[in-house]
Curated annotation (Swiss-Prot):
Protein known as: Thymidylate kinase
Keywords noted in UniProt: ATP-binding, Kinase, Nucleotide biosynthesis, Nucleotide-binding, Transferase
NCBIfam families the record matches: DTMP_kinase
UniProt keyword Kinase present: yes
Enzyme class: transferase
A biological-process GO annotation: dUDP biosynthetic process
InterPro entries: P-loop_NTPase, Thymidylate_kin-like_dom, Thymidylate_kin_CS, Thymidylate_kinase
One Pfam family it belongs to: Thymidylate_kin
GO cellular component entries: cytosol
Known function: Phosphorylation of dTMP to form dTDP in both de novo and salvage pathways of dTTP synthesis.
Signal peptide: none
Length: 210
């Protein structure tokens, strides 16, 4: 079976990891080889970069340094994990990818969109999502969920609400620009309803007839 690359995008607390687990179960039940991964992270060096980016270790970073660390982590993630997995026929399900960079470092931080896209293309080369599932959620709801979850990875959650609103708008704008690839899904629903919507999209998109 041909490898597929499916990315999950959205703001904080949108439920990406939960829905990746749900889709993984559905695919594996039908004999699909699945690899789940995340960004930043996914391989040892990229996970070390993640620690800097999403915890208090990164508080002193400016926007340029933050971006360069993200791109370095992505380069190694693609090289070490994503490209080999796709070549071996796995379906790769990734929690965040290039769209998050455009939304957070572009929409949220105010970075130059065309320049970010150029850098992104240079880093990823021929690796590009077959499908992107955008879990859309009001930032006030998502941030409340994330706060209840707790943990040390709270650096971005501490940004102002206006930052997260800009991130959301950037995601939605990208979905309008690329409607064939990037599918917005209402994440303010019960987990199983969101999972069912995602499965219908995946099944229909790839003509899955198991």
């Amino acid at each position: 079976m041909q490898g597929r690359f499916i990315t999950f995008e959205g703001g904080e607390g949108a439920g990406k990891s939960t829905q990746i687990a749900q889709l993984t179960q559905s695919l594996q039940a039908h004999g699909v080889k699945v690899l789940c991964t995340r960004e930043p992270g996914g391989c040892p060096i990229s996970e070390r970069i993640r620690e800097i980016l999403v915890t208090g270790q990164g508080d002193d970073l400016d926007g340029t340094s933050e971006l360069l660390l993200i791109l370095a982590a992505r380069h190694e993630h693609i090289r070490q994990v994503i490209r080999p997995a796709l070549a071996s026929g796995h379906w790769v399900l990734c929690d965040r990818f290039e769209d998050s960079t455009l939304a957070y470092q572009g929409g949220g931080r105010g970075g130059d969109g065309p320049w970010l896209r150029q850098l992104g293309q240079w880093i990823r080369g021929d690796v590009f999502p077959d499908l992107t599932l955008l879990l859309d959620l009001d930032p006030t709801v998502g941030l409340a969920r994330s706060k209840r979850r707790g943990g040390q990875e709270q650096r971005f959650e501490q940004e102002a609400l206006s930052f997260h609103q800009q991130v959301r708008q950037a995601f939605l704008q990208m979905a309008q620009q690329e409607p064939q690839r990037m599918i917005p899904i209402d994440a303010d629903q019960p987990v199983q309803m969101v999972a069912a919507t995602i499965w219908r999209e995946v099944e229909g998109r790839f003509f899955v007839s198991f």
